[in-house]
Amino acid sequence: MKFLGIDYGQRRTGIAVTDAGGRMAFPRRTIAMTTRDAFFVELLGMVEVECPDAFVVGLPRLPGGEETLTTRQVRNFVERLKRRTTLPVYFMPEELSSFEAEDDLRDAGLRGRRLEAVVDQQAAVRILESFLAVPEERRSLA
């Protein structure tokens, strides 16, 4: 299966995809949030190009598992996404994926605008990699 990973944010959303076999994840794009409609046009346009079998959306929580305002925003986004597509949507619990992605990119020598341009994509890659490591029977649909 091919998955499209999403690191949703109020200002920017990182997108990554897996290969057709669902073994490796690759960064694809960062979508800037201008309007909700424009955002979904761009996201669903990527779906047409990438042809994923399902979405994987990072679900941020505090280290103790508590939900936050951001968690609720992601859940609301997923509900809007599900109204626009028939593809299944999986949640992948995440803690600090953006911070870890930023560390990875800094270690690779990226700074400033170059880092900011791809950090959300790298976070989406981390979300997908975590998801792919979970046995299928333990994956949770949104």
UniProtKB/Swiss-Prot annotation:
UniProt cross-references to InterPro entries, sorted A to Z: RNaseH-like_sf, YqgF, YqgF/RNaseH-like_dom, YqgF/RNaseH-like_dom_sf
Pfam families associated with the record: RuvX (PF03652)
Chief subcellular location: cytoplasm
Single Gene Ontology MF annotation: nuclease activity
One cellular component (GO) term of this entry: cytosol
SUPFAM superfamilies named among the record's database cross-references: Ribonuclease H-like
GO BP annotations, alphabetical order: rRNA 5'-end processing
Keywords, sorted A to Z: Cytoplasm, Hydrolase, Nuclease, Ribosome biogenesis
Gene3D superfamilies: YqgF/RNase H-like domain (3.30.420.140)
Enzyme Commission number(s): 3.1.-.-
Subcellular location: Cytoplasm
Domain of life: Bacteria
Free-text function comment from the UniProt entry: Could be a nuclease involved in processing of the 5'-end of pre-16S rRNA.
Family membership noted in the UniProt record: Belongs to the YqgF nuclease family.
Entry-linked PANTHER family: POLYNUCLEOTIDYL TRANSFERASE, RIBONUCLEASE H-LIKE SUPERFAMILY PROTEIN
Name the record gives this protein: Putative pre-16S rRNA nuclease
Organism of derivation: Nitratidesulfovibrio vulgaris (strain ATCC 29579 / DSM 644 / CCUG 34227 / NCIMB 8303 / VKM B-1760 / Hildenborough)
